[in-house]
Amino acid sequence: DLPPHSVYLNSDYSMVERILQNLLTNAIRYSSGDIKMSLKQARENRAIFTIENPIDSKTEINPARLFERFYTGDASRHNSGTGVGLAVVKLLTDKLGGNVSAEIKSNVLTVTLEIQ
């Protein structure tokens, strides 16, 4: 989903690109169904990126550790990553003055960044 008009981010392009790549890679790696990504413009000059993907109900996620380096959730998964992707998302989002949050129950990750 995209807004009907252009959204200009007042940010470092390479950092935003890395954030989106890491979110998508993580979603693809752990998804058990269709992935939905959206971009919305909010009031207060903010862009909101949301990625939603269904995960295997057997996957255990500790919300308190989700953005920690090397945290991989369910270590028994054969396609588990290194555990740095979401930590990098958090680091870069913080550097850009934004915010990242997770709704574990519905498996939605949200990144909010400043726009022009």
Q: What is each model feature region?
A:
Residues 4, 8-11:
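Conserved micro-motifs of the catalytic ATP-binding
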Residues 27-28:
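Short helix-loop "hinge" at the ATP-lid/N-box region of the Bergerat-fold HATPase_c
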Residues 85, 89:
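Short alpha-helical Gxxx[C/S/T] motif in the catalytic ATP-binding
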Residues 34-45:
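Short beta-strand/loop element within the Bergerat-fold HATPase_c
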Residues 16-17:
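A residue-level detector for a conserved hydrophobic packing site
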Residues 58-71:
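Short conserved segment of the HATPase_c
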